[in-house]
Structures are given as structure tokens and as C-alpha cells.
A protein has these predicted regions:
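Bacterial Sec-dependent N-terminal signal peptides
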Residues: 1-10, 311, 330-332
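N-terminal hydrophobic or amphipathic segments with adjacent small-residue motifs
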Residues: 2, 16-19, 277, 302
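N-terminal nucleophile
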Residues: 9-240
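C-terminal outer-membrane/trafficking sorting elements
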Residues: 246-332
């Protein structure tokens, strides 16, 4: 059998991790389905979730061998950034400029994300990274689709699956994939998947797929219906859960100044902070500092860092208490 390769693009998707529960998630949609691509299950084709380890989306001119190579590199212990670097250097068609990738891994509870958007992917194209997620898309209506997905993920309360659905509903706009403008929908097929640690990769906790819909029927609406039915049938209510446990108002984390220059302050009104980690947008750890005498206010030297955006993760008594983003704008 010849390896499967699709000249079609896959558009908007997200991979994400709950660092507390160890759940790993994957969701996406495209203006292609099992009818346009006979013998395929639709957009879910791009999803590779490895329970307890991470998730990979290989999209835009999907090629099965690129996906398999990424899978094997993750099993070998490569970080998301290392996997992408390897894929770019070893593209099966020697043409990484047409590919798009989003990768996340659990990394013992300190998630790492990485993305890649080739210059020859169809516009509009982009990706955005968070500490525990990667969102990517091509042939989009515009940056607003990526932004709305990110907002939907970050602002939806509940567990990982709820937040993934929030991200997907953020793209529930006619023509989100511009090829579907004439259909009056965002896409033609969609999926949402979540694996718990220890799941069989072929039988993960949540595995929902809309392989295709009749003309004019919105796949993201159908996916939401299917998800709500799944929750009802399984008596699953995670509305009070959260990827990071909510802090009491008395334990708010303050980071200032932001944007920062040479010094940044981290303040917590509660149990003193015992450790902080700073990472760049690829998930690479820049600073990992244990606090010998835990304090409620930390002064961190960041003058050696280049201008740009960074993530800072704060710990107290060995537990993660906050993930925040900050900007450095005045260093050379």
C-alpha cells in the first residue's frame, strides 16, 4: 500500500495539555470531509495523540510518513521543538515550506509547545503558542480566527475537553476556512479528542469525530451536540474543574512591570513562592530557579533576555500555582 498523501490543506486546529491531570487533547476542523477525500475519516486524519506523552498535528499537504516520523521522534524523547526541527530537515518530499505543525508534550507536568508554519502554506496562515497549547491554521479568513480560538480556550472554564470545545467554537464562523464560504459553514469536518494517562492509544477517553455533514450543516455545531451527548451519556460534568486550580483572591499572582526591562517582580499574597521557571514561546526553559528562602515577592533579573514574549511558571510548596505571560521590550 502506498503511503497516504493529501494535496488538500488542513486548516484550524489545537493541541493542548492539562498539566495537573495529565490529559492530552487534540481538536480541529477543515473544509474537507470523507466525501471529498474518499477512504478518510475527515479532519481527524491529522490528529496523533500519544497518551501520557503528547500530541502532534501535521497539517497542510498532509503526508502520512511525516506524521509517522513525528510520532517516532516523540516516542524517542524529542521535545516539540526538536521534532519540528527534525521534520523540517527531513521532510519526506524535501519541501517543508508547504507544511504546518503544532506539537505539545507533557514533559513530567511542565508542558512544552512548538509550532511551524511554512512560508508556502496558503494564506491566511499562522500559529500561536501558549505554555500548554499550540493553535495553528491556514487558508483562514484572517488572524481573527486564531485569536478567537485562543480566547475561547483561555476563557472557557472547566476541564481540558471543555476548553478545547471553547477553542473550536471560537472558529465557528462562516468561511473560517475560506474554501467553505460558499457552503455557509466554517468547515466540512471536525473532531475533538482527549486521552487520559494510561489510555490505550486506540481507545482514548474522548474520541469524537464529525467526518462530514450535509450541505449547509455546520460541523462545529454537530461536534458540540455530540460532545454534550457524550457528557450526558457518561454523567461527565467537569464545569468546576480547571487546568490550573483557581487561586483565592487573597492569593493573586502579580507580575510587574509588564513589559519589563532588566528586573521583573513576582508577588503572591499567600503561601510564599518556592520556585519559578521562565520559558520562551517554543517551550524552551530559559531560567529554572529554586528559592532557598521562599518569599511572597521575588525580584528576578531578566536583563540578559532578548526582547519578546515569555512564560513564567510559579510554584509554592512544590505545586504549580500560576502560569503567566510577560514581555521584555527594552533590552538590546
Amino acid at each position: 500500500m502506498m503511503p497516504l498523501a493529501l494535496s488538500a490543506q488542513h486548516t484550524f486546529s489545537i493541541v493542548a495539555i492539562d498539566s495537573i491531570t495529565g490529559e492530552i487533547g487534540s481538536a480541529g476542523a477543515t473544509c474537507g470531509d470523507s466525501i471529498i477525500w474518499p477512504g478518510t475519516p475527515g479532519a481527524i486524519l491529522i490528529s496523533d495523540v500519544i497518551p501520557g506523552i503528547g500530541a502532534i498535528h501535521t497539517q497542510s499537504y498532509y503526508t502520512e510518513n511525516n506524521q509517522l516520523n513525528a510520532h517516532n521522534r516523540m516516542l524517542a524523547g524529542d521535545s516539540p521543538e526538536e521534532i519540528i526541527n527534525w521534520l523540517v530537515a527531513n521532510d519526506v518530499s524535501s519541501n517543508p515550506s508547504i507544511r504546518q505543525y503544532g506539537i505539545i508534550d507533557f514533559n513530567n507536568g511542565s508542558p512544552r509547545s512548538a509550532g511551524f508554519t511554512g512560508e508556502n502554506c496558503f494564506d491566511y496562515k499562522n500559529h500561536v503558542l501558549g505554555l500548554n497549547y499550540a493553535i495553528q491554521g491556514n487558508i483562514l479568513l484572517g488572524q481573527q480566527i486564531i485569536d478567537s480560538m485562543e480566547s475561547g480556550f483561555n476563557n472557557t472554564s472547566g476541564c481540558l475537553s471543555d476548553k478545547l470545545m471553547g477553542a473550536m467554537q471560537g472558529a465557528n464562523v462562516v468561511g473560517a476556512d475560506t474554501r467553505c464560504m460558499s457552503e455557509g459553514t466554517s468547515s466540512l469536518s471536525a473532531f475533538l479528542r482527549v486521552a487520559k494517562p494510561g489510555d490505550d492509544p486506540n481507545a482514548i477517553f474522548i474520541d469524537l469525530n464529525i467526518a462530514g455533514t450535509p450541505q449547509g450543516i455546520e460541523p462545529l455545531d454537530e461536534l458540540l451536540i455530540k460532545y454534550n451527548n457524550w457528557k450526558n451519556n457518561n454523567n461527565y460534568d467537569c464545569s468546576t474543574q480547571g487546568i490550573i486550580e483557581s487561586l483565592d483572591e487573597s492569593e493573586t499572582i502579580l507580575i510587574y512591570p509588564n513589559p519589563a526591562g532588566n528586573i521583573i517582580y513576582i508577588q503572591r499574597n499567600g503561601i510564599p513562592l518556592s520556585k519559578i521557571e521562565i520559558s520562551d514561546l517554543t517551550g524552551k526553559t530559559i531560567l529554572n530557579q529554586n528559592i532557598s528562602e521562599p518569599k511572597t515577592t521575588l525580584e528576578i533579573e531578566v536583563g540578559h533576555l532578548k526582547n519578546g514574549e515569555y512564560f513564567i511558571t510559579s510554584f509554592a510548596q512544590g505545586s504549580l500555582v500560576s502560569n503567566n505571560k510577560f514581555t521584555i521590550s527594552s533590552n538590546n
